[in-house]
């Protein structure tokens, strides 16, 4: 088996805030050259030096939404053409602070979307898998998603191909 020691890796966090049967979704339309351009995702971002998953998600959610929260749910591994990304996935149903409204977020436009409508938005195919796992209230899971460009090639849940 070929070693992947030269493949870049990064750690990220992603959080889905839940309220009244809806997720707070971020429509990524503000940054040029964004891997998530025009897609709808939860809020989060890349780890800064010496951050834990919780540190990262707390900081990113506070920066993008103005609120403070935490609740760890699982880890998702993305294998992209020349990058491996470990995304630490969170959900939250309670927070403190004042929520940033609409397009005041520098990353895109924040909008509450009913859960049953999220899969109809332009989202990554793999996101549909882990959003289903979140809805099933799985306490912890390991999901590996392999992409070629924007196309999902393989999904492995808890070590088993889906």
Language model feature labels by segment:
Residues 2-25, 46:
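Conserved N-terminal beta-strand and adjoining loop/helix that marks the start
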Residues 66-75:
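A short coil-to-beta-strand element that immediately follows conserved catalytic motifs
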């Amino acid at each position: 088996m070929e070693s992947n020691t030269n493949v870049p890796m990064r750690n990220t966090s992603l959080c889905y805030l839940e309220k009244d049967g809806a997720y707070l979704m971020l429509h990524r339309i503000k940054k040029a050259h964004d891997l998530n351009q025009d897609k709808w995702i939860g809020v989060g971002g890349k780890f800064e030096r010496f951050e834990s998953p919780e540190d990262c998600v707390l900081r990113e959610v506070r920066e993008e939404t103005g609120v403070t929260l935490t609740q760890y749910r699982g880890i998702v591994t993305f294998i992209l053409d020349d990058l491996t990304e470990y995304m630490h996935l969170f959900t939250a149903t309670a927070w403190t602070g004042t929520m940033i409204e609409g397009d005041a977020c520098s990353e895109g436009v924040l909008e509450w979307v009913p859960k049953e409508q999220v899969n109809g938005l332009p989202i990554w195919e793999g996101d549909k898998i882990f959003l289903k796992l979140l809805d099933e209230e799985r306490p912890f899971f390991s999901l590996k998603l392999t992409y070629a460009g924007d196309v999902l090639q393989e999904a492995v849940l808890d070590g088993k191909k889906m």
